[in-house]
A protein has these predicted regions:
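Extracytoplasmic/periplasmic solute-binding protein
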Residues: 141-142, 146-150, 155, 179-225, ...
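Conserved N-terminal structural module of periplasmic/extracytoplasmic solute-binding proteins
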Residues: 2-107, 171, 323, 343, ...
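Hinge/lid segment of periplasmic solute-binding proteins
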Residues: 102-154, 291-294
Length: 441
């Protein structure tokens, strides 16, 4: 029998998940580190947007008994991490597969204390082969593939084609040109904006997009953070120029009242999934207005430079074996590679390469984006050129950003002041999570 258990966030998740331990462990008295086999039944944890993926799996594999537990999907949230700390202490209770709410979760899920996420290198070699190395690079930790990407979420350069056509503007090709045009548009069209600063992914759009070393993992216990690096300096100069010109919103893209600002967005770097999730489904921007081109390059550099926003990670438990592991791997393979989820239901470009064209064909048929051929080419290119110099760490840079930059700007402080606060807090946060920090900032 298939069952589905929807759990709320907070302490109730921890208690209920512990109660489910017997469903996934097969032996509640197993010592910590011992692999167990339930005989086939699996428990999977998913956030709300991934519930349809689990339901599609249930329909495709009715003979596999599965508990589906809905968890808190807050990026940067601590509920899941707290649950896992309890499981690690008890030596049982872990889900057999999980969609990590935050990509940074893979850092604690693979450290020597937890070691939850299984090494998939030899378990799913054919699946791994289907990914572009640039897409899967975030799952490679110390030479081992410890997760699978759900979707490729590279930043492309989005723009409102209707606005550009109406006003005769030419698209920028460099970051510096973007800042200059953003300031010009803010002056000539007050209220029009060219980006958002208030969400955690602003770090990826602008700092990762510049190569600023905020998340340079040296080892499990050492990180390199250098906000005085030229790549950080150019990013902050760019943001200062646009912010001072009134071209950037201090809101975040996920804010409940961001739709009004979103309707006034004329251009911005942003993830592939912005097209369906933000523009179409959340902000209700009419079809035929938005399109995308390739990511921007920095002046003096020949290649585009872009970040990555999300593109969630699937993990499989290292604590299981036998039929339980086999079924968990079947689940992981399905959610990563099966078109019944990745093409039919998912809003983002599949991380798994062989499905990308099918997803693009579906988007073309839907007819939402303007200049679809240009957008599709940008999506595919961007997925292969995301800057590799940002690792997932136990400290969450995006959370530090929203706790420092956002409140500083909304209280009227300058971006320079906000940046200083961010830098100090980031280094303290990294040290709090056990990293020795190499820094000249």
């Amino acid at each position: 029998m298939k069952t589905k258990r929807i759990l709320t966030t907070g302490a109730s998740l921890v208690v209920a998940a512990l109660a489910l331990a017997g469903c996934s462990s097969g032996n509640s008295e197993a010592a910590a580190g011992a692999q167990t086999d339930s005989g086939g039944k699996i428990t999977v944890w998913v956030d709300p947007p991934r519930v349809p993926a689990a339901e599609a799996f249930q329909e495709a594999y009715p003979d596999i008994e599965i508990d589906v537990v809905q968890i808190d999907g807050t990026v940067g949230g601590k509920t899941v991490k707290q649950s896992f700390a309890n499981f690690d202490s008890a030596g049982s209770g872990w889900p057999d597969a999980i969609f990590f709410p935050s990509n940074d979760d893979i850092a604690w899920a693979t450290n020597s204390t937890s070691n939850y996420a299984a090494d998939l290198t030899d378990l799913l070699p054919d699946v791994i082969e289907g990914y572009d190395p640039a897409v899967l690079s975030f799952c490679e930790i110390d030479g081992k593939i410890r997760c699978l990407r759900n979707d490729a979420a590279p930043d492309v350069f989005w723009y409102n084609k209707a606005f550009f056509d109406e006003n005769g503007y030419s698209l920028p090709t460099t970051w510096e040109g973007y800042a200059e045009l953003a300031a010009k548009i803010a002056t000539e069209h007050p209220g029009k904006i060219s980006g958002f600063l208030g969400d955690a992914y602003a770090v990826n759009r602008y700092l990762q997009g510049s190569g600023c070393p905020t998340n340079d993992r040296v080892s499990e216990t050492e990180a390199h953070i250098d906000l005085g690096d030229p790549a950080c300096v150019r990013a902050t100069e760019l943001l200062t120029e646009m912010y001072d010109a009134g071209a950037l919103s201090t809101q975040g893209i996920f804010d409940g009242d961001a739709a009004e600002a979103g309707a006034n967005l004329v251009m911005s770097p942003g993830a592939v999934w912005w097209g369906n999730y933000l523009f179409r489904d959340t902000w209700k921007i009419p079809a035929g207005q938005m399109s995308a081109v390739a990511p921007l390059a920095w002046e003096g550099e020949s290649k585009p430079s872009t970040g990555n926003e999300g593109g969630g990670l699937w993990g499989v438990s290292s604590h299981i074996t036998g039929k339980q592991l086999e079924n968990a791997l079947t689940f992981a393979t399905f959610v990563a590679t099966d078109p019944r989820w990745q093409v039919d239901l998912s809003v983002g470009l599949p991380g798994y390469g062989p499905l990308q064209q099918r997803w693009l064909d579906k988007q073309r048929k839907a007819g939402y984006l303007a200049e679809f051929d240009d957008a599709a080419a940008a999506f595919v290119l961007a997925a292969t050129i995301v800057r590799p110099d940002r690792d997932y760490t136990r400290y969450n840079t995006g959370t530090v950003w929203t706790h420092t930059i956002t409140p500083a700007l909304t209280s009227g402080r300058s971006f320079t002041d906000a940046w200083s606060t961010f830098g100090d807090r980031l280094i303290r946060e990294a040290r709090t999570f056990g990293y020795a920090v190499q820094s000249t900032a």
